[in-house]
Amino acid sequence: MTDNQEIKPKKLTLGNSKLSLNKSFDSLTGAQSFVNAKSKTLVEVRKSSTGSATTLSLNKERNSLDQTVIDANKEEFNRRLSILKKAAEQSQLNDPSKISTLSKLASINQSANSKIEPLETDKEVEQKQQNTEDNKVEVSAKIVQDDKDIPSQIPKKKEETFVKSPLVGMRTRYGIESEKELDKTADSKIIAPKIKLEEPKKIKKADLFNMLSDDESGSCRTRSLASIKRAREKEKRKLASQAPEKVYREVTIPEVIGVGDLANAMSERVADVIKELMKLGILANASQTIDADTAELVATNLGHTVKRVQESDVENVLISDDKVEDLRTRAPVVTVMGHVDHGKTSLLDALKSTDVAAGELGGITQHIGAYRVTLADGRAITFIDTPGHEAFSEMRSRGAKVTDIVIIVVAADDGIKTQTVEAINHAKAAGVPIIVAINKIDKPDIDIERVKNELYVHEIIGEEVGGDVMIIPISALKKINLDKLEEAILLIAEMQDLKANPFGSAAGVVIESKIEQGRGTLTTILVQRGTLRNSDIIIAGTAYGKVKKMTNDKGLEIVEATPSVPVEIQGLNEVPFAGDKFNIVQNEKQAKDIAEYRMRLAKEKKISIAPRSSLEDLFLKASGNSKIKELPLIIKGDVQGSVEAISGSLLKLPSDEIKLRILHSGVGPITESDVSLAHASSAIIVSFNVRAGANALTAAEKEKVDIRYYSIIYHLIDDIKAIMSGMLEPIVREQYIGSAEIRQIFNITKVGKIAGSYVTKGIIKKGAGVRLLRDNVVIHEGKLKTLKRFKDEVKEVREGYECGIAFENYEDIREGDTVEVFELIQEQRQL
């Protein structure tokens, strides 16, 4: 290749080593300087006035490459600045100092752009000079290894521009020291350079904080996450090596506590508690319970102090006192009592102008109802209607406990009856005022004075004769003297000064409860203090839950109930008993604890009152000859009060030989599980105002289970009494039928001794029972083997006739002995 040949420009490539360029250009001398970042050497390029076409083309390409690198660095700087701005926005920096830092970064960007623009103008001047030059360019490289000379040769303002020179990289790669060598090796060694822009480095958290810090020099250094992690692990190892100081606590121990609960209360390991129990000779796991004494020993051995509490303390949250200034006047609660069909429900119909009796079978109220009547003057009276039948005595007694006034209804044409006397006794026991309403005065031929005289016998003395009981003749059907009855109620209520606290948590009593399909458990309650609201947590007996819905006696939904207001609520988990007290608690955990405590008490009480079997009964039962028979029953009813009354009445039936066993009693229709239980135990299902479902009925027919339906309670009781009477053993009674005197003894071959006798009284029957008396002492009792009249066998011989008698398996008979004849008669027993 000759110098005159035209050398085609080829693309230059960068070498393996990375170069950082601090370039300065002198327009007068045509000198450029390059700095190698790795070797810290300075490469100085001097241009002469002469040049060639090859050099010019290389210079053009080099200038274009320099311009490309400058543009790339400019774009890279702008991109990094935008990243910093976004990071600052995402971290939501509200510090004004940080905002000022961003403004500083923006100013730095503007200054950098202003520094790059003059450099671009210098490149244009250099390009023009290179186009006019015709001489060769002498390239000499002066390597300066002393680092101290670099700052003096490189202008300070060019330090902020970082450019990688492709020429320096090419020379470093191929070992070219002069431009002549470059011309010689242009065809063989020079390769077109490829511009490789480095990917932007990922901004670290520490770099971001340094950039955004107030210290412009960046001297504030943050610790890396790895160093923080190492410091934390070191601190943990240091703490682990130190023995933790044990904390001793005051432990509250109830009557019974679980091993795991005791360990949690002391903040001890369960294994340590079990070890202490093993030292005491007790083997228990974490789920088992121990008594309070054992728990106290364990806690004391582990260094804790003990505070003993009674299990009944869980009910202390239900106790609250009312302040006098919070009391407000409330409506009176009146209970209506009396005998069957004396007009109690009709009286309520007249008072509240609704037909309640239409829904009652035969006019007999089957369960308690609570109603609120508002009078013309705006005052209200709450009535509780208790059934009059004797089977509901327990329900009636509960009604008397929650009432302020008792109205005893007596029919003028019927007078005082058994249930009337019982109602009087309940009212006296409750210590509440009594008003006697003599009903049905509209009927002819009545004698009110006779009724008053009967009341005097039971110490019910009217005001007209100096007593303290108001006796008012009324007619519920004709609505006669109802206003006088209302005035008497309000007068007594005013004298009693009835007040209650309407503030705070509600409390009261359960009137009735039942299960209705599609609605769940429905409970009728009477609020006695406080205000009951929706979503309150209520506990009644062993039942608890959240109040989901409240309706008043008219069927309207309400959101709160004040004292003396009866409401029906939904939301309890089970059916409470009529007469159970209800309270409001803070949360469901408290309600659950109280319910569990009450269930344990009821279970212990049931076990303690269970009848003990005598040794004789156990032997008889083991041998299969037990005289005690059982009648298993399953009772289902429409409301809890009816089921409870039926159970109580049946258990009171007197019988020493028949044990009535109620396997299950509940509210709601008969289910398949009831049928399965009845089949397994050979029980009778007694249904009161409920029916069996289709599936339960099919199962009962298949298993041949007896289901009996009733709608009146005393019919049910009479039927069960008849069944129990049929199970009783009949009474065997001896009936004397005659006697004979032995006058002569005959010995007959193959027959034995025959007593020739004379019938002195009654008749003698063959096969009847006989007693042989000698000197009025019974020496034998058996049966007649033979009865003959002369040589003929006869069935009986009457008084005044002679006969021959032979005894079964007995021949020690003498003349003068007396034979008594009797029959055994079985009689059916009744309860």
From Swiss-Prot:
<dbReference type="InterPro" id="IPR036925">
    <property type="entry name" value="TIF_IF2_dom3_sf"/>
</dbReference>
<dbReference type="Pfam" id="PF22042">
    <property type="entry name" value="EF-G_D2"/>
</dbReference>
<dbReference type="InterPro" id="IPR005225">
    <property type="entry name" value="Small_GTP-bd"/>
</dbReference>
<keyword id="KW-0547">Nucleotide-binding</keyword>
<dbReference type="Pfam" id="PF00009">
    <property type="entry name" value="GTP_EFTU"/>
</dbReference>
<dbReference type="GO" id="GO:0003743">
    <property type="term" value="F:translation initiation factor activity"/>
</dbReference>
<dbReference type="InterPro" id="IPR044145">
    <property type="entry name" value="IF2_II"/>
</dbReference>
<feature type="binding site">
    <location>
        <begin position="338"/>
        <end position="345"/>
    </location>
    <ligand>
        <name>GTP</name>
    </ligand>
</feature>
<feature type="region of interest" description="G5">
    <location>
        <begin position="475"/>
        <end position="477"/>
    </location>
</feature>
<dbReference type="InterPro" id="IPR053905">
    <property type="entry name" value="EF-G-like_DII"/>
</dbReference>
<comment type="similarity">
    <text>Belongs to the TRAFAC class translation factor GTPase superfamily. Classic translation factor GTPase family. IF-2 subfamily.</text>
</comment>
<dbReference type="GO" id="GO:0005525">
    <property type="term" value="F:GTP binding"/>
</dbReference>
<feature type="binding site">
    <location>
        <begin position="385"/>
        <end position="389"/>
    </location>
    <ligand>
        <name>GTP</name>
    </ligand>
</feature>
<dbReference type="Pfam" id="PF11987">
    <property type="entry name" value="IF-2"/>
</dbReference>
<comment type="function">
    <text>One of the essential components for the initiation of protein synthesis. Protects formylmethionyl-tRNA from spontaneous hydrolysis and promotes its binding to the 30S ribosomal subunits. Also involved in the hydrolysis of GTP during the formation of the 70S ribosomal complex.</text>
</comment>
<dbReference type="InterPro" id="IPR000795">
    <property type="entry name" value="T_Tr_GTP-bd_dom"/>
</dbReference>
<dbReference type="Pfam" id="PF04760">
    <property type="entry name" value="IF2_N"/>
</dbReference>
<keyword id="KW-0396">Initiation factor</keyword>
<keyword id="KW-0963">Cytoplasm</keyword>
<dbReference type="GO" id="GO:0003924">
    <property type="term" value="F:GTPase activity"/>
</dbReference>
<protein>
    <recommendedName>
        <fullName>Translation initiation factor IF-2</fullName>
    </recommendedName>
</protein>
<feature type="domain" description="tr-type G">
    <location>
        <begin position="329"/>
        <end position="499"/>
    </location>
</feature>
<dbReference type="InterPro" id="IPR027417">
    <property type="entry name" value="P-loop_NTPase"/>
</dbReference>
<dbReference type="InterPro" id="IPR006847">
    <property type="entry name" value="IF2_N"/>
</dbReference>
<keyword id="KW-0342">GTP-binding</keyword>
<dbReference type="GO" id="GO:0005737">
    <property type="term" value="C:cytoplasm"/>
</dbReference>
<feature type="region of interest" description="G2">
    <location>
        <begin position="363"/>
        <end position="367"/>
    </location>
</feature>
<feature type="region of interest" description="G1">
    <location>
        <begin position="338"/>
        <end position="345"/>
    </location>
</feature>
<feature type="region of interest" description="G4">
    <location>
        <begin position="439"/>
        <end position="442"/>
    </location>
</feature>
<keyword id="KW-0648">Protein biosynthesis</keyword>
<feature type="binding site">
    <location>
        <begin position="439"/>
        <end position="442"/>
    </location>
    <ligand>
        <name>GTP</name>
    </ligand>
</feature>
<dbReference type="InterPro" id="IPR015760">
    <property type="entry name" value="TIF_IF2"/>
</dbReference>
<dbReference type="InterPro" id="IPR004161">
    <property type="entry name" value="EFTu-like_2"/>
</dbReference>
<feature type="region of interest" description="G3">
    <location>
        <begin position="385"/>
        <end position="388"/>
    </location>
</feature>
<dbReference type="GO" id="GO:0097216">
    <property type="term" value="F:guanosine tetraphosphate binding"/>
</dbReference>
<dbReference type="Pfam" id="PF03144">
    <property type="entry name" value="GTP_EFTU_D2"/>
</dbReference>
<dbReference type="InterPro" id="IPR023115">
    <property type="entry name" value="TIF_IF2_dom3"/>
</dbReference>
<dbReference type="InterPro" id="IPR009000">
    <property type="entry name" value="Transl_B-barrel_sf"/>
</dbReference>
<dbReference type="InterPro" id="IPR000178">
    <property type="entry name" value="TF_IF2_bacterial-like"/>
</dbReference>
